[in-house]
Structure formats: structure tokens, C-alpha cells
């Protein structure tokens, strides 16, 4: 099958590209920067320049394509807003896919998006789901909760580097999933006719709260976390303040997501029927414990090789501060 992956350079997109190639599919990637996508070409994918925010650039990438997996999203460093990329850009892509006569389309949404109409990203995801339902596409919607990869920068690195870990209290438990495992569901979605025009949760085996994750990182790293509390009132003020300036709209929209994280409503779901439908084995899915154990084991080994001190309380003689993480 000839599969177009949109957003192939991202955290999730690159795993989808790898999984699709490993499964024997011919992969084409629509990317904004050919230079940044060079590694995808080395893997065996065909790279085509284009931008979902510029509809006139989409048709060349859609030629002779059997299925589209859309993993694109606005990044925190983008000059474009979430609305421009995740709403207007998505509509451009969906319409272009329809015009090209392609039927299979995989879209990533967020679990329980319909419950948060005042949170821009959640509202946009919910509206896109409704828009897809009105098309003639054989779409599959995969509703995600959170990626394990994001926990490295949020918790693991600060704890290893003896920096502050920021918390807003006891946050919403989230069933995080490894992007490699999410990619398996995405590729299976284009292979299976039985999942057409359906919506599925794709989440980890267990929901974890912020305190539990911090304790897990402390145990595996041997360091104690320095926790700094940020009251929700402060985040709400920052969101309101950043709405005054056009160049901070993106930051404001992302701050709004803190309402979801502080709601206390767990982002999790029963995955047993989903694994059965997709023909995947839940035993092969990465657990958060194993993911963090592998990360800390690799990093601590590397630090020891570089003669860095991981725990400053055990420092003898000259202390070296670690700023090297990957």
C-alpha cells in the first residue's frame, strides 16, 4: 500500500513512518522542510514538500496514494496558531484528500475532547471529528491521552539535573502510551477495512498521576525531586494576559490545556476490545515503568562513562554539573 504520512518529522509521525516501512508499505511524507526530513529519506521514505496551511501545495503529494495518516499538529515554537494548523490546515488536507479520490484517512484526536469546549485544542479536535463524520471518507479516528516521550522533559531530565519539577497540584491521571505503540495502531488502521468510519481510544494500560510519575522517577534515578507548585489561578491569569497579544495566542491556547490536566477526570479507557479489533497483542505494549527504566538505565550508564556525578549528595572532590541529555 502507498501511504502518505503528514507530519512525519514529529515525535509521533516519525514512528509511523518507521512502522509503515517495516510493515512493507511504500511511504511518502509531506513535510514543510526538506532539510529536516532528510533522515526519513534515509529510512526509505519519499519526501515531498508541502504545507497543509497552503492548500495549493497538497495535490502533488496525494498522487497515487492509497491512504493518508495525518500526524501533523501545531508546535509550541510555530509562528502559526493552533487554529491555523489544527483546524484550517486539517480542513485543507481533508478536502484535498477527498478531491484526490482517496478513501482511507487516519486522524488523531484527544480522549474526551467533547467535554472541554472552552479549551481550544480540545474543541478543535472535537469539531474535526464531527467534520470527518460528514465526509465520505473511510476515516479512522484514534483518540490519544498522552505520550511517554513527553515525560522525559517534564519529569526525568529535571530530576536527574536537580532542577525544579513544576506541578499544579494533583493532576489528572493520564494513560500515557509510547509513540511506537501508537504507530502500530495507526498503520493497522489503514490495513483494516473493519475500522473504517469508527473511533477508538488508543491509550496506555494504566493512568498515572503526576505524583506517581515523580515518585517513579525518583526511585529509578536515585535523586529526590525539587517540586515547585504553580497555582491554577496563576496559569489562568497568564492565559488571560497572553490573549491580549497576537504573538502570544499560541501560548495562551496551550495554557488553556492546563484546565484539562487539573480537572481530575482520568484520561483512560478500556483497551481490551481495541486490541482485539486491531489484532495487536497488549503484552507487547510498553509500560511506563519499563519505558522510564530503559531511559534512566541508558542515561545513568552514559553519565558514569563521562564521569559525571548523578547525585550531588555523594559528590567527593570536584563536582561536575550535568547538562547532557538526549
Curated annotation (Swiss-Prot):
Alphabetical list of Pfam families matching this protein: NAD_binding_10
Keyword presence, Signal: no
InterPro entries with a match to the protein in the record: HCF244-like (IPR044256), NAD(P)-bd_dom (IPR016040), NAD(P)-bd_dom_sf (IPR036291)
EC annotation from Swiss-Prot or TrEMBL: 1.-.-.-
Gene3D superfamilies assigned: NAD(P)-binding Rossmann-like Domain
GO cellular component: photosystem II; plasma membrane-derived thylakoid membrane
UniProt keyword annotation of Transmembrane helix present: no
Main location: membrane
GO MF annotations, alphabetized: oxidoreductase activity
PANTHER family (UniProt xref): PROTEIN HIGH CHLOROPHYLL FLUORESCENCE PHENOTYPE 244, CHLOROPLASTIC (PTHR47128:SF2), PTHR47128
The name this protein goes by in its record: Photosystem II assembly factor Ycf39
Organism this protein belongs to: Synechocystis sp. (strain ATCC 27184 / PCC 6803 / Kazusa)
Gene name of the encoded protein: ycf39
